[in-house]
Amino acid sequence: MKSSIKYVIVQDYETGGLPSSTKKPFLDVPLCEVACVVVDMEKLEIIDEYQDMFKPNYKEGLVYEPKALEVNGLTLSMLEERGKDAKEVYNNLKQLYLKYKNPRQGAVVCGHNFTGFDHPFTIELFAYHGDDVWKYVKWVEDTQKLAYYANLEQQDYKLATCCADNNIALTGAHRAINDTRSNAQLFISYIKKLRGEGIAVSKEENKPFREQFKFQIPS
């Protein structure tokens, strides 16, 4: 049976702060920028990219933390000049999810620390516009989780460290499209390892289990 996973969308946000128990993603902590990179799961190649900025103050009460903007290099004037209305970005994301949906699993999205940080922003973005992201996205993957599984010990499990350990360049970090391109390559490297690419398999190991198994009677 052939896999029905044709595409994975690697996604990243830049935000104006960090969520907490008192500050909800998107509703209190503003979205500034989104980027997506689409991976063809048969060829393991990047086949499409998307990025947008959000116009600032898309709702009342948003607080843009200076330290957060300093890290990602964005300014409110940049967001005002290049940003789009949150509703337009929501629609663009929805169309991307629909374009690259898989036959059984719908859209599959992935990122680094994506489950804990990024995806809750998507959930609230869609809910704010009267929609449910789970209508389009069925599976959520996380390269940070894959790193924990793949490596029992390393310096840390940040994106930069994981990329460096896998010989993947990460330039212009903390801008959404740059992080996402490198993260897509990291995801591809993990998938290649899962598929055993580049790993030599002996003829004996390649035999079906029935041929390898030899029943022995205890003496």
Walk through the language-model features, giving the residues of each.
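Residue-level recognition of the N-termini of beta-strands and the immediately preceding loop/turn
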Residues: 105-108, 136-141
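Substrate-recognition/cap helix-loop segment adjacent to the acidic, metal-dependent catalytic center
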Residues: 117-139
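Conserved non-catalytic scaffold segment of RNase H-like nuclease domains
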Residues: 2-123, 164, 168, 174
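Short alpha-helix plus adjacent loop in nuclease-associated cores
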Residues: 140-154
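Acidic two-metal-ion nuclease catalytic site recognized across multiple nuclease folds
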Residues: 2-3, 165, 181-219
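A structural motif
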Residues: 151-164
